[in-house]
Swiss-Prot record:
Gene: Or7a40
Record-linked InterPro entries: GPCR_Rhodpsn, GPCR_Rhodpsn_7TM, Olfact_rcpt
SUPFAM superfamilies: Family A G protein-coupled receptor-like
Organism in which the protein naturally occurs: Mus musculus
UniProt keyword Glycoprotein, yes or no: yes
Record protein name field: Olfactory receptor 7A40
Upper taxonomic lineage: Eukaryota, Metazoa, Chordata, Craniata, Vertebrata
Alphabetic keyword roster: Cell membrane, Disulfide bond, G-protein coupled receptor, Glycoprotein, Membrane, Olfaction, Receptor, Sensory transduction, Transducer, Transmembrane, Transmembrane helix
Summary of the function given for this chain in its UniProt record: Odorant receptor.
Compartments it resides in: Cell membrane
CDD domains from the UniProt entry: 7tmA_OR7-like (cd15234)
Length: 309
């Protein structure tokens, strides 16, 4: 007897990172702490770049957009997770699940695009320093950010709309702390080939494209740095992109970790645990990576905190 597809489902169950009740208080405290640190760190960067005239440059304009995207990325999943743990109710409505799919894809891919834009900014700064302000003018900066938003929004709208065509049977349990599109596709009873193809091509175009741009930019940056004769000049040139390179390495290494964990393990919660690295830990660490060795940003933050006090 075949299972009948239930297209009128009203809810899913998010199993989270662990179903062990003994772990729930620890997980609540840990993720609440990481979420608050993420909000505070990224908000400080946004406020500092807006209020301090020394930071009104293309690099910090892109950084403030990345900080905003990171806040939204974590806010798409962590608040609901905290509510579920606190209330001991793992249910999420169908509408809420589709909304999570939309925003999780939107801000996750937007991070990817903004990192590529920032790599291009560093390429122009190091390889064409005399023409930097001419090339990276306000119009181009606005176009790059707006283009990133529009492209990722259209992709997210397409993929979440495709999720609406999925039909589900009896198992509505998602072994994750967020409604991830891939998990919904795995639960679906009907033909998922169109969804698989859209996800596949989106991963190649919107994931591989920005990564290729980052790699190309840094290949040119490395060539330019090697051509500098003095060691002090090489160090100064490299230091301008060290923070961005660290963030890029962290972001893509954690994404690779998620892919490998989902491919080589049978643990249903392993993907969720690995996803914490790129969806929670990376947005939390980004403000520290960008500010610790950045004298301009640290100075702006000190001036901001002095004004507040």
């Amino acid at each position: 007897m075949e299972l009948k597809n239930d297209t009128q489902i009203s809810k899913f169950i998010l199993l989270g990172i662990s179903e062990d009740p003994l772990w729930q208080p620890f997980l609540f405290g840990l993720f609440l702490f990481m979420y608050l640190v993420t909000l505070l760190g990224n908000l400080l960067i946004i406020i500092a770049t807006i209020t301090d005239s020394h930071l009104h440059t293309p690099m910090y304009f892109f950084l403030s957009n990345l900080s905003f995207a990171d806040i939204c990325f974590t806010s798409a999943s962590i608040p609901k997770m905290l509510v579920n743990i606190q209330t001991k109710n793992k249910v999420i409505t169908y509408e809420g699940c589709i909304s999570q799919v939309f925003f999780f894809i939107l801000f996750g891919v937007l991070d990817n695009f903004l990192l590529a834009v920032m790599a291009y900014d560093r390429y122009v700064a190091i390889c064409h320093p005399l023409h930097y302000m001419v090339i990276m003018n306000c119009r181009l900066c606005g176009f790059l950010v707006l283009g990133s938003w529009v492209t990722t929004a259209l992709n997210s709208l397409l993929q979440s709309s495709m999720a609406l065509r999925l039909s589900f049977c009896t198992d509505l349990k998602i072994p994750h702390f967020v409604c991830e599109l891939n998990q919904l596709v795995l639960l679906a009873c009907n033909d998922t080939f169109p969804n698989d193809m859209v996800m596949y091509f989106a991963a190649i175009l919107l994931g591989g494209g920005p990564l290729a741009g980052i790699l190309y930019s840094y290949s040119k940056i490395v060539s330019s740095i090697r051509a500098i004769s003095s060691s002090q000049g090489k160090y100064k040139a490299f230091s301008t992109c060290a923070s961005h390179l660290s963030v890029v390495s962290l972001f893509y290494s954690t994404l690779l970790g998620v892919y490998l964990s989902s491919s080589f393990t049978q643990n249903s919660h392993s993907t969720a645990r690995a996803s914490v690295m790129y969806s929670v830990v990376t947005p939390m660490l980004n403000p520290f990576i960008y500010s610790l060795r950045n004298k301009d940003l640290m100075g702006a933050l000190r001036r901001l905190l002095r004004r507040k006090s």
